[in-house]
Amino acid sequence: FLKCTEHKNFAIIDGAMNDLIRPALYSAYMEIIPVDIREEGEARCFDLVGPVCESSDFLGKDRELNIEAGDLLAVCSAGAYGFGMSSNYNARNRAAEVMVDDNQVHLIRKRETIADQLRGEAVLPG
């Protein structure tokens, strides 16, 4: 979802601070690029923010990107900091992880489900 105002453009993305906390926690920079390069249109400056509704829920600020709503983005160099520092904040499922090796893409961890989150829960005896 893109939200453009007179002073700032926002790309509200599926990724959030619960997936990659480093930008919110200590302003870590991770390159964020569109998976498919657009031939049409021009790059605009965006803040890439998540849906968690916290002022610190961002993955990138002031990024020049040629994107439209629905585009798939790659967060580069997240590496071991992704899952190891992720959480279920706001009951969000942990993200899937992919590894890119040259031109091969491998799913190395499936996206978590609500059932995964609740697996260890127990109901008190009534």
Predicted feature locations:
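Charged (often Lys/Glu-rich) extended helix/loop segments that serve as interaction or gating elements
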Residues: 1-126
